Amino acid sequence: MNDEQQNSNQSENTKKPFFQSLFGRFFQGELKNREELVEVIRDSEQNDLIDQNTREMIEGVMEIAELRVRDIMIPRSQIIFIEDQQDLNTCLNTIIESAHSRFPVIADADDRDNIVGILHAKDLLKFLREDAEVFDLSSLLRPVVIVPESKRVDRMLKDFRSERFHMAIVVDEFGAVSGLVTIEDILEQIVGDIEDEFDEEEIADIRQLSRHTYAVRALTDIDDFNAQFNTDFDDEEVDTIGGLIMQTFGYLPKRGEEIILKNLQFKVTSADSRRLIQLRVTVPDEHLAEMNNVDEKSE
C-alpha cells in the first residue's frame, strides 16, 4: 500500500465515525433544539463534510421559518409605481431608469393603496413594433396578489412556487400598502445576495441612458454627483442630490416637475409623499464637452 492510499484510508476512517455520530444523533432523537442542529451543521463544515456555502444555505433555510414578510419586504417608500393612464413612452422610461421587471400599477397618484394590477416589462415589447396609439395599459395588467405583513416567509416561498407568481403586495393590519416582496428577496435569505447585470449600476447610483441623459438616484451623495458631472454643488446643508433639489424647490416636488441648476436639467421621475426617489438629469452639449475634457485630463 502506497502513502497516498494509506492517507486516503485514514481520511475515510476519520469521516466514518463522524457520519455515524451525526446520523446517530438524528435518528436516535438526540437533537432537542435548533441550537444543537446548528452545532451539528457547523461541525460538519469543520470536518470538511460540507463547505461554507452549503452550511450557509442550510442555515438560511432554517432562518426563513422564523422570518415574517415584513422582515424582508421592500418598503413602500422604495416602490416604483406606474399610473394606469401613462402612455407607452412614459412607461418605457420608467422601466429603463429603474431596471425592474415588474411594477405595481395605481389608478391615482395620490392613492397608492389602490393597486389595480401588476405590469410585466416584457409585455411592452410587442408595442415597440406596433403603433403606440393602440397601447392600452389596462389590458396588460396581471392580477395583484395581496399578503399580510405577518405571513411567514417559508409559506410565502411555498405560495410563490405553487401558484407560479414572483411578486406580492404587502399590506398592514389596516389594509394599507406597506411594501412588496419578491421570490428573489426570499432566495437571497437562503443563498445570499443575487447580483444581476443591473446591481453594479444601481450601487453606483448614476446610470447613463443616452449621450445626454442620466438616471440618478435621489440618495446619491453630492460629492459623487459632482465628480460624475463636473459640478460644484455645496454639501454643507444637504448630503444628497435629492436633498439639494428639494431645498431648491422649497418643497417636495412631484413626479414630472423640472428645474435647471448649473446648466443641468433635473426632472423628478419617481417620488412618494415623503421623499424623492429617482431623477433624470439632462446634460447640454456645452457641459458635456466640459465633462469630457475633465475625463481626458484625468487619463
From Swiss-Prot:
CDD domains: CBS_pair_CorC_HlyC_assoc
Name of the featured protein: Magnesium and cobalt efflux protein CorC
Entry function: Plays a role in the transport of magnesium and cobalt ions.
Similarity annotation: Belongs to the UPF0053 family.
InterPro entries referenced in this protein's UniProt entry, alphabetically: CBS_dom, CBS_dom_sf, CorC_N, FAD-bd_PCMH-like_sf, FAD-bd_PCMH_sub2, Ion_transp-like_CBS, Transptr-assoc_dom
Organism, scientific name: Haemophilus influenzae (strain ATCC 51907 / DSM 11121 / KW20 / Rd)
Entry-linked Pfam families: CBS (PF00571), CorC_HlyC (PF03471), NMB0537_N (PF21917)
UniProtKB keywords: CBS domain, Cobalt, Magnesium, Repeat, Transport
PROSITE patterns membership: CBS (PS51371)
